[in-house]
Amino acid sequence: MGFWSSVGSCLSSAISCVSSVVSSIGGALASGASSLLKVAGPWLGPIGQIAQVIGIALDVLKPKEHVEELGAKAMESDKSMADFDSTSEYIDYIRNDIKLDTEKFEHATEAEKLARLAIGTCITIKGVEEKKGFDIPMDTWLALGKMGMEKLEGKSKDIDAMIEAFKTGESAKDLNAYVDGKLDAKTELAVGDKLADVYRQLEPEASKEAIEKRVIDAQVGG
């Protein structure tokens, strides 16, 4: 009980931290980052890594750029995303015009670390959505985080394929429920078949058993 209480307290402090910089990052980004903190909770780290991987693959971020540093710099900015015509222009501004305060970055509290991670992840997700041309449901990011997609070989290709396959709200919701093992038998079978199709496209030479294992392994809560 004490552990989960401390986690909840840290998340609440991080949300307060996000709210305190709303004048820098803007209301829309502050709302998105706060929602991400509330929904993602312990999966925020993996989701941030996944967003970073696909962000670099799509040239939203440059190689070796980190979502946490992006978020920290956004918190120091005097312009918000609303001041720019596109997310890519906003990211370019943060990249080129805002200097990272390394002293502040290295001595941040746990709440500040969570806040900047959530902000940087949200910015990157918006950039990915801009590149892809559609909004990506939060359930998709949450499911990918639970599945540990950030740990895979060739992960950017896998992540992109999953985003494409589960880009509608209903399919994303079903995927997240599948990962948690909370679907009825009929819907679970349908999602499993869809996952198998994705994995077969990614690995056309893989055996039936290997594909089935990936489908089963995706169900971390089953």
Question: Which residues fall in each region the model found?
Answer:
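Membrane- and interface-active hydrophobic/amphipathic segments that mediate membrane binding, fusion
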Residues: 1-90, 94-101
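Alpha-helical oligomerization segments
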Residues: 2-10, 17, 197-222
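Generic secondary-structure transition motif, activating predominantly at the C-termini of alpha-helices
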Residues: 15, 33, 37, 167-170, ...
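Amphipathic, membrane-inserting segments
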Residues: 56-210
